[in-house]
């Protein structure tokens, strides 16, 4: 049972982006599709992350709400910010609204928001 508790603890500490990547890897490994459960898990993870941010006000999440007309520029900027590969960045942009970066300082969140908006995206900071 201790091993299962460790797995649950490790999974609980994943960011939304890490959880999405884990989901894709498991889908490939097991040959299944988990489209609906992934959306529910991502929404639950985002809601869980939002509560501590409101209490502390020292960490913010940068949420991409819409890619806008210049999707290619937004994908390039997301890649630069997150270090994701082309496919992962494209999936994140096309799956908006999604968290681009979580638990960042207010200054970094403002900087990331400006970069993404300059690329043509609509961004929220929560």
Swiss-Prot record:
It comes from the Bacteria. One of its GO terms (biological process) is translation. InterPro entries: Ribosomal_bL12 (IPR000206), Ribosomal_bL12_C (IPR013823), Ribosomal_bL12_C/ClpS-like (IPR014719), Ribosomal_bL12_oligo (IPR008932), Ribosomal_bL12_oligo_N_sf (IPR036235). Gene3D superfamilies: 3.30.1390.10, Single helix bin. One of its GO terms (cellular component) is cytosolic large ribosomal subunit. CDD domains: Ribosomal_L7_L12. One of its GO terms (molecular function) is mRNA binding. Keywords: Ribonucleoprotein, Ribosomal protein. Homodimer. Part of the ribosomal stalk of the 50S ribosomal subunit. Forms a multimeric L10(L12)X complex, where L10 forms an elongated spine to which 2 to 4 L12 dimers bind in a sequential fashion. Binds GTP-bound translation factors. Belongs to the bacterial ribosomal protein bL12 family. Forms part of the ribosomal stalk which helps the ribosome interact with GTP-bound translation factors. Is thus essential for accurate translation. This is Large ribosomal subunit protein bL12. It comes from Rhizobium meliloti (strain 1021). The lineage of its organism: Bacteria, Pseudomonadati, Pseudomonadota, Alphaproteobacteria, Hyphomicrobiales.
